[in-house]
Amino acid sequence: MVLSVIPVLYAANTTDFSSFGLGVLTDTISCEVTEERNGVFECLLKYPVSGQHYGLITKECIIKAKPNDTAADQAFRIYRITKPLNGIVTIYGQHISYDLANVPVLPFSTEGRSPQLILSQLLAGDTRFTGWTDYSDAKAFSVAQPKSVRACLGGTEGSMLSKWYGEFEWDNFTVKFHSHRGQKTGVVIEYGKNLTALEQDEDNSGVYTALLPYAVYTPEGTDTETVVTLPEVTLPIVTSEIVRAKTLILDFSDQFGDAAITEEALRAKANSYIKANPLGTTIPTVTVSFEPLWKQPEYSALLERVNLCDTVTIRHSLLGVSVSAMVIETVYDTLAERCKSISLGQSKSSMITTISE
């Protein structure tokens, strides 16, 4: 086994992962890293109780593991270790960025500040972390009550994710907030070529027939909130998938910044939202396993890679599946240095349940 792909164990307070720490976990049976778009980023490792370093593996320790084909090795803090079963324990680790779930942010408010400055301010409570973003447009931002840093980043009303959207990338102690993390790769995963397994799931819970937009603001000189809605109340969403009325109620308050909130402006933003989001159509989630062509000798010159948030094409002629969609989840086999599976479609989780906890 190549030493560079074997997970390494570190003490709980480690911040420099360039050494071999407490030891290289050469007896590791399996190690998988799962990452979701703006969601879960975890490591699952199986290790024998007879392994050389078993006695050193405790909760809060850190495991360094390879998360995908292109990124640097990432640090995962152990939060759960199962009881031995047939002489093997299962070790669960969360990405080191989950430490930010326990770093508090006190209430503050700003009328207009760049996202880079806001990100730096939020991360100031833990000097191990730094932030980067390619967003530049300033917006009003506030924290009304004490929250964790991760809750301020995403998963709660008024978070950075809810204001700028985008996609987070967690690179050890660097928090990267991309406007678009992935790219349109041109990669095709096809039956008869490199597709080994496919599962398609269609969920219409995100399909609606109408959108009811509203926005709330407090007029200058008053303490009373004003709610702006449309005279027609809702805007229609074209769909042929459901016959019953199903309305999406959505708050657009965060989308105005310093601009005046009017019926006309609200209608324009709501129509833009309908146009940009497939609210009237089921977008299937496709989970596939495949053989990376770039790891096969005859295709070694290929520069193709599949990473989280990339757009790829899946084709299976026998099942009639042909879809181009965003990669929303990757499961990576660290020891084999290969992507075990990817999921394409709409985000299956959000930072509401995974970041703000």
Where in this protein do the model-derived segments appear?
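Short polybasic amphipathic segments
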Residues: V2-D16, V175-F177, L211-Y214, V312
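Short, surface-exposed beta-strand/loop "edge" segments at domain boundaries and coil↔beta transitions
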Residues: D16-S19, G51-G55, T70-D73, Y98-N102, ...
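Surface-exposed loop/turn motifs at beta-strand-loop junctions within extracellular Ig-like
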Residues: D69, W164, H316-L318
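Extended Gly/Ser/Thr-rich low-complexity repeat segments
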Residues: H53-N68, A101-E111, G186-L195, L302-D310, ...
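An acidic/polar, Gly/Ser/Thr-rich interaction patch typically located in mid-to-C-terminal regions
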Residues: I29-G55, T196-S356
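Charged- and aromatic-enriched interaction segments used to assemble
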Residues: L85-I88, Y92-G206, S324
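Beta-strand-rich assembly/attachment modules of structural machines
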Residues: M1-S120, T130
